[in-house]
C-alpha cells in the first residue's frame, strides 16, 4: 500500500501551526541577520572595519546556542510546550519591535544587541521545536514531520536572505525592513496560538540557572544516551559542519571560480537550499512511514560523491572573461554540471539529516528529550565554529583553493561515516535491509506487537541464509544485536560489518556480551540452524526474560511474512 504524501500533515491542526510558527521564525532570523549584514556593508557608516562587524554579527548570533541551549532544554521538560512556544514568540515580537526602531534610527550597537537576543530566542526555541514533534505526531509520521520541518527551515533561510536583499536595495530600506520583521514576528505569534497542548514531561524539574554547569550536565546527558542516539548527535552536528562550510564559501566560490555576480550567488544558494528541501521531502516517501535510519548511509555516500564531483568540475571549469549573472551561468555547460553537483549535495544532505533527527527524537526518553535536543544544538554550534576555523586554516594557512577545500571536507565526510557506522552497525544493517526490500524481498510482520517496545528480550531465529539477517533487522523498530552459533561463510562475514557476532559454544548465557546486553535491557537475536535446541539450553537460565521465536515464511516471489510467536518466558522468581 502506498504511503500517503507527507504534505498531508500540513492539513492537520496538530502539525500545521507548529510548522508555520517555526518557518516564520527561521525566515525572520535570516531576514534580520542578512539585512543587518547588508546595512553594515552598504548603509551604516562606522569607524570599525566592515568585515570585522560582519564576523562579529555571525558570532553574536551563534554564541547564544552555546550559552542558552541547555536552559532551553530545561524549559522544554519543565513547562507545557505550546504555552512555552507562545511565550517565546511573544518575546520575539518584543525583540523585533526594538529591532525595528534600531533599524529606523540606524543604531548599530542596538542592532547588534537585537541580533544577540534573536539568537537567544532561537536557542531557547530549538529544543522545544524538535522535542514537541513526537508529542503531536505518531512514530509513523516522524520522518514526514521532520522532513517538512527541514524543508521549511532551509526554504525560510533562503527566503529570508533573498527578501533582505530586495528590501535593502530600496532607498526606503529602513521602514521596509522594520515593518517586515515586526509583521513576521506577529504572524508567528498568531500561528503559535493554534499549537495543541503538549504536556510537560518533567514538571517537577528544578531549573539550574548556572550556564556552564548545566551545559556540561546536558552534554553528559546527551552522550549518556543509547549509543545510536549519541552517535546520531555527532552525525547530525557533522551535517551542520558541512552546511556551514558550503554556505559560507559559496559567495567567494561564485565570484572567484565561476566569475559570477550577486545574482549568480543567489542562484547557487537557491539550488543548494532547494536540494536540501527536496531530499528532506523525499525521505518520507522512501521510509514507508517509519524511522528509517537505513537512508543515512545512502545520504552520506551521496554527499561525498557530489562533493568530489564538485571539486572535479570546478577544477576543470574555464570561467568566462565577462562577469556572469544567473542566466549567463545557466548558459555555461560546465556551470550546469557544477549546479547539478550542488543540488546533489543538498538532496543527499536532506536524505542524511532527516532520519538522524527522527532517531534522536524517537529513541530519547520523553522526560529527557528536550535536553537531549539541547545537547545536540550545543554540539551543532560547536561544529559550525570548527568549520569556520578549519576553512581559515586550509584556505589562509595551507593555501588550498575553495574547490580543494570542498574535496577535503568530502573525504572527511567518508571518515566520519566510517566512524559512525562502525560505532552503530545498525545503520548499515538497516541500509542493506532497505535496499533488499526495494529490489528483491519485501517483509510484512505478523505478531510484531509481541516484541516489547522497551526492555530485554531474546529472539530465536532459524538461520539458513545471510539475507535473513537483513530482512529481520530491517523489520524491527528498535535496535537488534545479532549473534550466531554457526560458522560464518564468506558472504556472511560481510555481516560482521553490520554488527553480527559469532558465539563460541551453545550456551549463550556464558557469553559476557550477551549477558551484558540483557542486563542493559537490549533486544538480542540468536541465529541458529537449530533454534529449538538453543531454547532448551536457555530455558533454565533466562530468568524473567521474554523469549520469542521468529520465522520467515514465503508469501510470494518477492514477499515474506515475519511471523513472531512466544517461545516462552521464565518467571523472575524461578530458581
Question: What kind of feature is each model-predicted range?
Answer:
Residues 2-16, 197-234, 257, 323-330:
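Juxtamembrane intracellular "pre-TM" segments in multi-pass secondary transporters
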Residues 16-33, 57-95, 110-169, 184-185, ...:
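Substrate-agnostic recognition of the 12-TM MFS/MFS-like secondary transporter fold
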Residues 35-46, 100-105, 158-181, 256-257, ...:
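Transmembrane alpha-helix termini and helix-breaking/packing motifs in multi-pass membrane transporters
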Residues 78-92, 285-305, 400-402:
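Cytoplasmic membrane-interface "Motif A"-like loop-to-helix N-cap segments
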Residues 90-106, 301-331:
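C-terminal ends and interior cores of transmembrane alpha-helices
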Residues 129-131, 135-136, 181-208, 314-317, ...:
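Helix-loop junctions on the cytosolic side of multi-pass membrane transporters
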Residues 175-193, 404-418:
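Symmetry-related core transmembrane helices of the 12-TM Major Facilitator Superfamily/SLC fold
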Residues 442-575:
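Soluble catalytic domains of membrane acyltransferases
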Amino acid at each position: 500500500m502506498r504511503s500517503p504524501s507527507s504534505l498531508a500533515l500540513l492539513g492537520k491542526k496538530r502539525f500545521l501551526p507548529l510548522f508555520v510558527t517555526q518557518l516564520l521564525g527561521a525566515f525572520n532570523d535570516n531576514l534580520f541577520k542578512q539585512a543587518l549584514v547588508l546595512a553594515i556593508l552598504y548603509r551604516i557608516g562606522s569607524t570599525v572595519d566592515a568585515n570585522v562587524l560582519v564576523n562579529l554579527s555571525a558570532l553574536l548570533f551563534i554564541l547564544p546556542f552555546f550559552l542558552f541551549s541547555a536552559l532551553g532544554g530545561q524549559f522544554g521538560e519543565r513547562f507545557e510546550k505550546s504555552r512555552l512556544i507562545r511565550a517565546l514568540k511573544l518575546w520575539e515580537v518584543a525583540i523585533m519591535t526594538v529591532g525595528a526602531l534600531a533599524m529606523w534610527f540606524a543604531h548599530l550597537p542596538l542592532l547588534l544587541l537585537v541580533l544577540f537576543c534573536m539568537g537567544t530566542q532561537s536557542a531557547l526555541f530549538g529544543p522545544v521545536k524538535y522535542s514537541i514533534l513526537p508529542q503531536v505526531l505518531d512514530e509513523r509520521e516522524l520522518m514526514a514531520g521532520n522532513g517538512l520541518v527541514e524543508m521549511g527551515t532551509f526554504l525560510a533561510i533562503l527566503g529570508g536572505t533573498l527578501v533582505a536583499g530586495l528590501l535593502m536595495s530600496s532607498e526606503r530600506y529602513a521602514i521596509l525592513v522594520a515593518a517586515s520583521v515586526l509583521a513576521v514576528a506577529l504572524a508567528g505569534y498568531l500561528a503559535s496560538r493554534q499549537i495543541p497542548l503538549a504536556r510537560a514531561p518533567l514538571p517537577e524539574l528544578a531549573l539550574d540557572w548556572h550556564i556552564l554547569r548545566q551545559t556540561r550536565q546536558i552534554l553528559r546527558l546527551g552522550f549518556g544516551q543509547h549509543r545510536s542516539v549519541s552517535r546520531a548527535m555527532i552525525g547530525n552536528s557533522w551535517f551542520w559542519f558541512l552546511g556551514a562550510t558550503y554556505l559560507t564559501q559559496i559567495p567567494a566560490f561564485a565570484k572567484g571560480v565561476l566569475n559570477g555576480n550577486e545574482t549568480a550567488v543567489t542562484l547557487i544558494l537557491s539550488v543548494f537550499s532547494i536540494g536540501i528541501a527536496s531530499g528532506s521531502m523525499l525521505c518520507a516517501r522512501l521510509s514507508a512511514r517509519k524511522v528509517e535510519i537505513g537512508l543515512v548511509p545512502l545520504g552520506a555516500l551521496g554527499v561525498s560523491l557530489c562533493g568530489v564531483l564538485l571539486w572535479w568540475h570546478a577544477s576543470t571549469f574555464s570561467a568566462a572573461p565577462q562577469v556572469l549573472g544567473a542566466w549567463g551561468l545557466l548558459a555555461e555547460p560546465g556551470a550546469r554540471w557544477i549546479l547539478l553537483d550542488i543540488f546533489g549535495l543538498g538532496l543527499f544532505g536532506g536524505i542524511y539529516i532527516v532520519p538522524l533527527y527522527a532517531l534522536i527524537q524517537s529513541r530519547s526518553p520523553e522526560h529527557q528529550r528536550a535536553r537531549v535536543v539541547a545537547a545536540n544544538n550545543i554540539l551543532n554550534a560547536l561544529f559550525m565554529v570548527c568549520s569556520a576555523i578549519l576553512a581559515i586554516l586550509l584556505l589562509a594557512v595551507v593555501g588550498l583553493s575553495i574547490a580543494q577545500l570542498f574535496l577535503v571536507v568530502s573525504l572527511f565526510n567518508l571518515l566520519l561515516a566510517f566512524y559512525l557506522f562502525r560505532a552503530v552497525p545498525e545503520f548499515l544493517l538497516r541500509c542493506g535491509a532497505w535496499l533488499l526490500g526495494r529490489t528483491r524481498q519485501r517483509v510484512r510482520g505478523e505478531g510484531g506487537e509481541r516484541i516489547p517496545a522497551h526492555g530485554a528480550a531474546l529472539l530465536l531465529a532459524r538461520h539458513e541464509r545471510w539475507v535473513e539477517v537483513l530482512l529481520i533487522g530491517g523489520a524491527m523498530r528498535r535496535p537488534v544485536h545479532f549473534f550466531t552459533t554457526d560458522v560464518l561463510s564468506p558472504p556472511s562475514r560481510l555481516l560482521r560489518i553490520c554488527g553480527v557476532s559469532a558465539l563460541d559454544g551453545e550456551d549463550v548465557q556464558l557469553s559476557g556480551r550477551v549477558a551484558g546486553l540483557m542486563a542493559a535491557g537490549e533486544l538480542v537475536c540468536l541465529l541458529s540452524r537449530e533454534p529449538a535446541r538453543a531454547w532448551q539450553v536457555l530455558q533454565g537460565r533466562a530468568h524473567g526474560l521474554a523469549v520469542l521465536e521468529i520465522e520467515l515464511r514465503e508469501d510470494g516471489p518477492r514477499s515474506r511474512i515475519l511471523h513472531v510467536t512466544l517461545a516462552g518466558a521464565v518467571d523472575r522468581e524461578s530458581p
